[in-house]
Design a protein with these regions (language model features):
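Glycine-rich, acidic/polar active-site loops that bind/position phosphate-bearing ligands
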Residues: 125-313
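Histidine/acidic residue-rich metal-binding segments in metalloenzymes
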Residues: 2-15, 19-101, 105-123
Length: 314
C-alpha cells in the first residue's frame, strides 16, 4: 500500500485557494477580496497588504523561500523572476521576511528580451506584471526549492498586451458584458456573470530513450515511421488498449503533481497514433484552464527526464 495516493487529501494542497483564504484571512478582508475576484472591484492597498502577508506565511509553511510573478509572454511558455522574501539585515545581523501588497499586485520586469521588446534598450521596453486574482497562487517545488507563483498579466507602459493572458482576460470581460445583455433581452434579470470554460488536453508521444540520440529525427518536428502502421486491430496498442507500464508509471507521477497544484487531471488513455497517449483535465474557467495548461506542460517535461521514463520533453 506504499503507492496509495489519497487524492482528496493531496488535491490543491499547494494552492492558495478559496478554502485557504477563508481559513487565514480576516472575514472583512476575505469578503473584499471575493468582491474583487467576482465583480472586478478595485482592491485597496490596505486589503492587499493583509492578503500578501497571509499568502507569504502560507507559502513559507509550504517551504517557499522566493516568490515570482508568473506570466505567459509570446514565447509560448511561462516566464518568471524569483525574489526572496528576505529584507536588508537589521543592526543585529538578522533579517526579516517580508512581502507587501504592492509586491503582490504589481511588478516591473524587463520586456526587452521578449518578442514584443525587439532590439529596444531595457529602459525603453518596460513591461508591467499585474496580479490576476481570479487565478489562485500556488507553491511550486523543484530544484530551486519552493517558489510562490503568482499568476499575472503582462502589459506595456501604455497598456498594450505583451502576453497571452491579457487578451484572454479582456475577451472574457467582453463575452460577459455582451452575454449579460443578451440574457436581459430574453428576460433573465438574475444572472450576474457569464464565464466561458475550456478544457485543454495534452498528447504525450512515448518514444524510447535511445531514440533521443537521433537528433536528426528530433529536428524534423514530426512523427516518422519506417513502415506503414497496421490498419486493423492486429496490435493491442489501440485507443482503448491497455496503457503500457512505463507510460502508466509516468502518468501516475504526472497526475499526483497535477492534483497537488489543483489541476483536475481526469482522463488518460492511448491515442489513435502508435506510441502516443493523452491526458485530459476537467473543464475550468478559461483563464484558469490556460494557467493549468502551462502547469501541466511543465510537469510533463519535468517528469519525463531520463533516467526515469526517458520520454521526450517536447
Amino acid at each position: 500500500m506504499g503507492d496509495y495516493i489519497n487524492v482528496k487529501e493531496i488535491f490543491g494542497c499547494d494552492v492558495f485557494n478559496d478554502s485557504v483564504m477563508q481559513d487565514r484571512l480576516p472575514k472583512k478582508v476575505y469578503r473584499e477580496l471575493k468582491k474583487t475576484i467576482e465583480e472586478g472591484k478595485e482592491l485597496s492597498m490596505e486589503i492587499a497588504d493583509v492578503v500578501a502577508h497571509e499568502m507569504k506565511e502560507w507559502a513559507i509553511e509550504k517551504g517557499a523561500t522566493h516568490y515570482c510573478h508568473w506570466f505567459q509572454p509570446l514565447t509560448g511558455v511561462t516566464a518568471e523572476k524569483h525574489d526572496a522574501f528576505v529584507t536588508a539585515p537589521r543592526e543585529d545581523g538578522k533579517v526579516l521576511l517580508s512581502f507587501s501588497g504592492k509586491e503582490l499586485i504589481k511588478g516591473e520586469p524587463d520586456a526587452s528580451s521578449f518578442p514584443s521588446g525587439g532590439l529596444r534598450a531595457t529602459f525603453e521596453a518596460r513591461g508591467y506584471t499585474t496580479w490576476d486574482c481570479t487565478s489562485p497562487a500556488f507553491v511550486r517545488h523543484d530544484a530551486a526549492g519552493g517558489i510562490l507563483c503568482i499568476p499575472t498579466a503582462f502589459c506595456s507602459y501604455t497598456g498594450e498586451a505583451l502576453d497571452q493572458k491579457t487578451p484572454l482576460l479582456r475577451s472574457m470581460e467582453a463575452i460577459n458584458t455582451q452575454a449579460l445583455r443578451l440574457l436581459r433581452l430574453f428576460g433573465n434579470t438574475t444572472s450576474k456573470k457569464v464565464t466561458p470554460s475550456l478544457e485543454l488536453s495534452r498528447n504525450i508521444p512515448g518514444r524510447q530513450g535511445e531514440m533521443l540520440q537521433r537528433k536528426d529525427l528530433i529536428y524534423t518536428g514530426r512523427t516518422l515511421f519506417g513502415a506503414m502502421p497496421p490498419k486493423g486491430q492486429e496490435m493491442d496498442d489501440h485507443y482503448f488498449g491497455t496503457i503500457r507500464q512505463r507510460i502508466s508509471a509516468y502518468m501516475k507521477e504526472v497526475n499526483e503533481e497535477c492534483w497537488k497544484l489543483g489541476v483536475t487531471a481526469k482522463t488518460q488513455h492511448n491515442e489513435v497514433a502508435p506510441a502516443q497517449h493523452e491526458l485530459a483535465p476537467i473543464y475550468a474557467p478559461v483563464n484558469i484552464a490556460a494557467d493549468h495548461n502551462q502547469i501541466m506542460m511543465r510537469i510533463l517535461k519535468k517528469s519525463c527526464q531520463p533516467p526515469r521514463y526517458a520520454l521526450p520533453a517536447s
